């Protein structure tokens, strides 16, 4: 399944490393993931989310606020794959593995999670080990240079992550599915209204997926009460707004102890042409 990020030859696991025929070797980390980022393009030590960001996101997600989304994603993926006895699923930009672990419940599916952050994939391994999940593998890798062979996957899933038209089309089998999850127009609107003078709805993401056709689109929304200042702050840290907000806006955020918000998501299912 894995290919060498240097020469694109097939990788084979030999003891505690992955090797290709051309002599390139990638050791399996103590946590159990493999680093397939090339230093020519990315510094594995600094790429993606740092350990503090991964920890904050993990603590928030593990409180269950986004559990309905994870279950809905598994439901949508399961319906697409219902006639496939042993599907291969790539979770591209898998983060700390919250959604990956839910997808692992799909029968005999084999799940491969990748993220550019080695801190994120290290936590993925911790998550699946604690849950007793055995059908997941994780690698530090880029969504724009996937370490997988051509036409090797039945499905790619991208949840709040970068989307690569060319790479997803390359790794998917003919007719393979791509599920993209993004914020709906009203996602967290109440939180924005509390922080900003003129809140606005989210604009639809445009991905330029000309190698795919859109099969279905679901707007999945529900309300959630965020019942502590720490959770509100952690949630805001997970959004793009965190880095664009003024000191005045951050002061308003820190004054919130409880807020009910709309959790809204667009779940789009595409099929490779």
Predicted segments with their positions:
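A short acidic, Gly/Pro-enriched loop at the edge of an enzyme's catalytic core
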Residues: 144-155
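A short glycine-rich, Lys/Arg-flanked "PGG" loop and its adjoining helix->strand segment in the class I
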Residues: 165-177
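N-terminal auxiliary segments of SAM/dcSAM-dependent transferases
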Residues: 1-46
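Class I SAM-dependent methyltransferase SAM/SAH-binding core
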Residues: 88-91, 96-145
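Conserved Class I S-adenosyl-L-methionine
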Residues: 220-273
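Class I SAM-dependent methyltransferase Rossmann-like catalytic core
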Residues: 43, 48-68
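Conserved alpha-helix/loop element of class I SAM-dependent methyltransferases that forms part
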Residues: 64-85
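Conserved beta-strand signature within the Rossmann-like core of class I S-adenosyl-L-methionine
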Residues: 176-185
């Amino acid at each position: 399944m894995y290919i060498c990020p240097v020469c694109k030859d097939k990788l084979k696991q030999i003891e505690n490393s992955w090797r290709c025929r051309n002599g390139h070797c990638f050791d399996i980390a103590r946590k159990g993931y493999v680093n397939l980022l090339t230093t020519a393009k990315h510094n594995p030590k600094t790429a993606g989310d740092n350990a503090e960001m991964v920890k904050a996101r993990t603590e928030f997600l593990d409180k269950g606020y986004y559990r309905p989304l994870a279950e809905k994603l598994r439901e949508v993926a399961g319906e697409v794959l219902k006639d496939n006895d042993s599907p291969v699923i790539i979770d591209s930009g898998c983060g700390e593995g919250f959604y990956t672990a839910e997808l692992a419940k799909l029968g005999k599916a084999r799940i491969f999670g990748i993220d550019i952050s080695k801190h994120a994939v290290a936590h993925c391994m911790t998550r699946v080990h604690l849950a007793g999940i055995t059908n997941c593998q994780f690698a530090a890798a880029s969504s724009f240079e996937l370490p997988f062979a051509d036409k090797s996957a039945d499905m790619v899933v991208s949840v709040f992550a970068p989307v690569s038209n060319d790479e997803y089309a390359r790794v998917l089998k003919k007719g393979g599915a791509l599920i993209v999850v993004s914020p709906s127009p009203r996602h967290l609107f109440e939180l924005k209204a509390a922080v900003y003078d003129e809140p606005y709805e989210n604009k639809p993401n445009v991905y330029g997926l000309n190698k795919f056709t859109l099969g279905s689109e679901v707007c999945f929304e529900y309300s959630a009460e965020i019942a502590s200042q720490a959770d509100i702050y952690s949630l805001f840290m997970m959004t793009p707004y965190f880095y664009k907000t003024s000191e005045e806006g951050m002061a308003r955020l820190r004054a919130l102890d409880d807020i009910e918000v709309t959790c809204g998501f667009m779940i789009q299912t595409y099929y490779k042409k």
